[in-house]
Design a protein with these regions (language model features):
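Peripheral docking tails and interdomain loops at the edges
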Residues: 105-140
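A short helix->loop->beta-strand "cap" motif at the edges of active sites that frequently abuts
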Residues: 98-104
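Conserved binding/catalytic microenvironments
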Residues: 1-92
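Short, well-ordered coil/turn elements that cap or connect secondary structure elements
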Residues: 43-45, 99, 119-120
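Generic detector of intrinsically disordered, low-complexity, polar/charged segments
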Residues: 30, 104-105
């Protein structure tokens, strides 16, 4: 994964480009999908900031509140089977993102909730095709 990280770092983007904060869900150590998402972001002209694996929700909220990102991409692998914890984290982060005009993307095959009217808005992507489509929509 270090080789992929070096590839990502080699892609130059404008300092004025939109910024995406990348992290895995609490309790999730799987970062390969997140590295691939970071590569996709760079290819679409986004700056990326790596929060890393198992970043606690309060730390992510502090970064959202500081104005340091336009998007938060949170990944959970299929092995992240604690659906209640993922739902709680998604709701908490969706509320913080909505309050600060940050787009939340929940990705991976973890047991994330589906977008619903009783939740603050977020995007749910299951694979890289859906992620590329989302990035293309956001560029327009």
């Amino acid at each position: 994964s270090r080789g992929l990280a070096r590839c990502v770092e080699s892609l130059a983007v404008s300092p004025n480009a939109p910024r995406c904060l990348l992290a895995t869900a609490e309790g999730d150590e799987h970062t390969l999908g997140l590295l691939l998402a970071e590569l996709s972001l760079r290819e679409h002209g986004w700056n990326s900031q790596w929060a890393g694996r198992m970043t606690p929700t309060p730390e992510l909220i502090a970064r959202i509140e500081s104005g340091g990102c336009d998007m938060l991409a949170l990944s959970a692998a299929e092995a992240s089977s604690d659906a209640e914890r993922l739902r709680n984290q998604a709701f908490t982060l969706a509320s913080a993102c909505q309050a600060h005009d940050v787009h939340l993307v929940l990705g991976g095959r973890g047991l994330w909730p589906e977008p619903a009217t009783h939740l603050p808005p977020f995007s749910r992507v299951r694979d890289f095709r859906e992620f590329h489509e989302l990035l293309a929509r956001l560029q327009n």
